[in-house]
């Protein structure tokens, strides 16, 4: 089944190598399907997701919040989450 929408988000890892701190950013995706939302570490049935919200930060970043049956999952994103939220709410 093809995803309705895929929202990229930033995963940040900090490492210390040879007495130097390095920050490594990788891109992950939150995939929205008709019946579920998939993240790299979880799969949520649409009925287990109560809401999806966001909050803008400085420097063009934004927090995307998945309010789920097991708690709130937070993702840092660089692009607008408006289309992801719109598609999610159209399923509810």
Question: Model-found features: residue ranges?
Answer:
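Acidic, Ser/Thr- and proline-rich intrinsically disordered linker/docking segments
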Residues: 2-11, 44, 50-92
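Phosphoinositide-binding peripheral membrane targeting modules
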Residues: 22-59
């Amino acid at each position: 089944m093809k995803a309705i929408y895929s929202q990229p988000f930033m995963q940040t890892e900090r490492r210390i190598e040879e007495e130097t701190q390095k920050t490594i950013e990788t891109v992950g995706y939150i995939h929205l399907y008709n019946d579920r939302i998939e993240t790299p570490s979880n799969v949520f049935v649409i009925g287990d997701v109560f809401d999806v919200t966001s909050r803008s930060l400085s420097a063009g970043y934004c927090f995307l919040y998945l309010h789920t049956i097991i708690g709130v999952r937070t993702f840092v994103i660089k692009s607008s989450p408006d289309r992801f939220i719109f598609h999610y709410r159209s399923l509810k």
